[in-house]
Amino acid sequence: MPEGGKALNGMLRSEKDLIALREAVLRQRDPNKTCVTICGETGCLAWGGEELRLAFIEEIRKQGLERQADVMRTGCYGLCERGPIVVILPQQIFYQQVTVEDVPEVVSETLLGGRVVQRLLYVNPATGRAVTYDHEVPFLQRQMRRVLSDNGWVEPTNVHDYIARDGFAALSKVLFSMAPEQVIEEVEKAGLRGRGGAGFPTGRKWRFTRSSPGDVKYIVCNADEGDPGAFMDRSVMEGNPYLVLEGMLIAAYAIGAQNGYIYVRAEYPLAVQHLKIAIARAEELGLIGDEILGSNFSFHLKIKEGAGAFVCGEETALLASIEGKRGMPRARPPFPAVAGLWGKPTNINNVETYANIRSLILGGAKAYAAIGTAGSKGTKIFSLTGKINNTGLLEVPMGTTLREVIYQIGGGIPKGRLFKAAQMGGPSGGCLPPRYLDLPIDYESLTQVGSMMGSGGMIVMDEKTCMVDMARFFLNFTQDESCGKCVPCRIGTKRMLEILTRITKGEGQEGDIELLLEMGQVIKDSSLCGLGQTCPNPVLSTIKHFRQEYEAHIRDKQCPAGICEALTFAPCENTCPVRCDAVGYTALISARRYDEALNLIRLTNPLAGICGRACNHPCEKMCKRGEIDEPIAISSLKRFAADWERRMGKMAPPTFLERSKEERVAIVGAGPAGLNAAYHLGRRGYPVTIFEALPVAGGMLAVGIPAFRLPREIIDYDVQFICQHNVEIRTNQALGKDFTIDDLLRQGYKSVFLALGAHGNPRLNIPGEDAKGVLPGVDFLRRVNLGENVEVGDKVAVIGGGDVAIDAARMALRLGAREVSIVYRRTKEEMPANAEEVEEAEDEKIKILYLLAPTLILTDNGRVKGMECVRMELGDYDESGRRRPIPVRGSEFIMGVDTIIPEVGYKPELTCFKEEEGFKITRAGTLASDPVTLATHI
């Protein structure tokens, strides 16, 4: 808002003058006057925020509204993803992604007409509802803004705006009603800890500095924020520089300092500009200088612009830089509180620490300490970046969980992908995997799991992030920023980086992981400063939580995330379980070379016709085209190529890679795994015999998927193609009934491949599930597909949300059921079934009842007559990134049904394997085998 007149600009010589100025400013302002506030932070400026501000000024002038409306540039609102942000006060109407072209409409509709421009409102992705007011935006609604509370209400360089919101009231309070010792005691009682990363108690640091002998002492603000993805301090300085100055003034009074420095990197030109203006205006009013507010306290402040060296965030390196020396750490003790700047006692805190002081003093230690956890008090600002829907700044109480930040405030992971990890504490922090989503974010909790608070950077990663490459990225940064003073940091990080680079290039060796762990620990233990002591953290934490990714890079020469170029041909190919060359065959199809495309598919996948119809195509989820608009229809193109050959009526001849061998191989199970293994073994010259318990080949393809979705002639065609390659299939041969493993070995088979599938039905574990009319989903589909006469009632309920549940429901409808319902305990968004199949079910008028779970099956003479269900609501998120369903108390009701088909998963049936034969069953219900070769103990 505009500055006041000359009477508001005189020197303040007492506490009464400050109060009088505040009252004068407030008298001159109409709280009900319209004010168009525009985010003026660097991010929104990059979006065109300054041009937007000028456009509003011009349009308001054109409409003759200068007396009715002001235009004000403000600090960061936090929701940087949606900039430029415009908020209309006093109503607090929240507009996002506003452009210069939108200005005339906003002025005419909102300022003149009092109507909201709907298309500029923020739409809540969870509800699809447009949000009108800023306090309704979920990103802002769930925060506790203390340091950022003035952002959006003050013009950053306008000292009167700041004073009007109790600016410098805390300084006045300590100068005229508190002794320095009382100030320190208040900060100690509040439990404020340094927000720069180490978390050292602020009050204790102030006390150390005050108690150090010497007449000359210094206050220093560490504004050298250099973490990748971090911009908390920059936004505070840009949006409310007076808040930082007031905190520094109070600290200077408490420790007895007369001079101070703000060390800010020159890469923050807007922050530097605002700080210079703020210092100048404070000096004009007598809030910085000699005898502040007529007291005997004097303080002078200078800005020192740093060159951007990351190591200068370390306090002794920072002090050396202020002194004009090269920014390099020194050994401690003595600590800066004893011998700091020019050998004098010096207190160093970062921007956010000083910005906490005003609210702490005005509200009192008790109120401040009521926020947060036992060991971490107050709020913390985080910069939320990476694979997250809502990037930006957020301020939450200490102890808020990672889950709340990522899903409730951050809006979850884009494109429905899964959360993989969060890098906390910047390049020197550690990553947190999904099992730590419910970890409270505080100093102690993060340290216990190998991470750190740092300055507040939080980088979110999804399944497309390679953790090895991420560790290499952060180590490359810290190695490049190492000052080189100590050998462990200078040489050790270089050697670690070389190893990581080799691994990402596919040149990793056995023992590299152990060497990284050993070197990382040595560097942590022997480095001189905090940079070296923490820089191995990303490597150590990724090995701890994602060791299997390192092993995949080294042993399998694969990057599971498809990021490392040397190990990845294309993301789609890398994601495919059989590494099918989707890039190649789509290109061949586009060139109308259909036979070559099919041959390329069959290099890795002989089930082209089947997978073109029944595959869940994870390749499309990773398709680069999907980041622009929609993924390429990779699965449909595979189907097209396979159908083209079948229509031509000429099956491709067999192709063998090696000459025939004498060693025979037995395969148990003619499902997709068994057929694929037989095909590749046959191509390499091995005679293969498949023993299948069912009367048909195909396994779950034949008996688990309905023919209307996967026609039997398609299965038969692909099986016939496989059998050309020296493969024999014997049906009605069940392991444990018709033969044993010993029988196969006695018959001369040199190896046995077990591909039994998962044909078992997990139980619901509710009363009544053994009644007549309860047909387990896998059994139901198998019986129908094998031609058995399966009767269903008029009203069928299918329990579950997967593909088998959808198939069972559609099959029940075809068997004569008049009404079919699917009962699923979560919402449609969490449903694991293929979206296309869900749509087909809805088109067939199948009811899908979401947020519902069965609790009891009602019977009459042993037969189903109904089912009791309870309504569910979504609670917290689980490790898969889905919200847990929670029963709604008292919401039980009865569904009238006569057939229930439970389908809540499937499991392997391993009763044919005996421990006395040498087989071992794991706790998860699978056969124990080597994790790399999958060989059993036999």
What are these regions (language model features)?
Residues 9-34, 50-73, 90-119, 170-187, ...:
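Ferredoxin-type iron-sulfur electron-transfer modules in oxidoreductases and energy-metabolism complexes
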Residues 660-673, 792-802:
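Beta1/beta-strand and adjacent pyrophosphate-binding region of the FAD-binding site
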Residues 664-689, 805-813:
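N-terminal Rossmann-like FAD-binding beta1-loop-alpha1 element of flavoenzymes
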Residues 770-794, 877-938:
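FAD-site-proximal beta/loop scaffold in flavoenzymes
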